């Protein structure tokens, strides 16, 4: 296990199709100190897919870098996590929030929210088999009728995860509604492991307001960084900034 501290950080979210290495370097140049690679399919990493293995690659500029994987089978998750650690990942994150049909039909991503006990076993085996911290990223549930994020968060913590990222929408909502920071705050209060809040952080003042009001340990920024990669600098300096 590394000494990775998941508190007091602003993370660049794992952005599928957007968070490639050049983009991450751009964010680093504008103040981002914690980066994550694009989601990688664990089973493809295990098969040796070049394109998937490329998602585990970090640049020397990325001093604090994590890899996110999508997995349904513990053996694949562990092997992919070990491969990520061997390539310099400081931690490995399990995606339990991706709403895309191709992901959920394979039993990965948001599907795992519907099977908390299976998710717990998966996380426990990852924690046991991967030599760096294991984290989990979830949504609030499969739908508003299946809002079980508190249960999922408890299971994840009991399985040994080092931290939990919570995106404030359900799988069904995708991005159709505003992120529910009241729900994120509730989960942060219920858990002892660091909870990282994610969703609708588009400005430096939203970042500070939501961080303080919710009591989360850290923030994770996705679309806000795609809109302006220098948002990390703005958050640190507490003022708007425009590149010239």
Put a short name on every predicted segment:
Residues 1-244:
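Flavin-dependent oxidoreductase catalytic cores
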